[in-house]
Amino acid sequence: MSRDWLCRRLRLSPRQSYSLVRSGYGPCVSSDAVLSLVNKSRRNIAAPFDHVPCDILTADELAQTPELAESGFVPRDFLVFTRRENPNNQPPFLHLNKQTTRFVKSLFLDWLAERAKDAERTGRRRFV
């Protein structure tokens, strides 16, 4: 991937990108190097990032985002999806890749809204 794209995505300066991702000094960076760096940041092995894009947040990190922190919970159903290797009923936009959960935030919120409507119609709670 392009180093410029990485800088825009993680909100880094070019100098920071070279000091953090040392995979060569060319214009490209491997996605494995970025994933490794983000996971080290998650485990407090490396300094935490100021900004991690929403599509590589884990479910626990997502719970800390302002939109879901206001509601006070991440649905247990969704946490189960993220912890199973081969979920049978996962949302179509969810992909598991090692320790990173990749999804589009707007699709996730639409999925939650749709599930909430189904629960209201049937009279049973799907979450918590």
Language model features with spans:
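Short, charged amphipathic recognition helices of the HTH superfamily
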Residues: 1-4, 55-64, 75, 89-90
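Major-groove DNA-recognition helix of helix-turn-helix-type DNA-binding domains
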Residues: 8-36, 65-101
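A short, Lys/Arg-enriched interface patch at domain edges and termini
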Residues: 28-61, 65, 105-128
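General secondary-structure propensity
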Residues: 3-6, 108
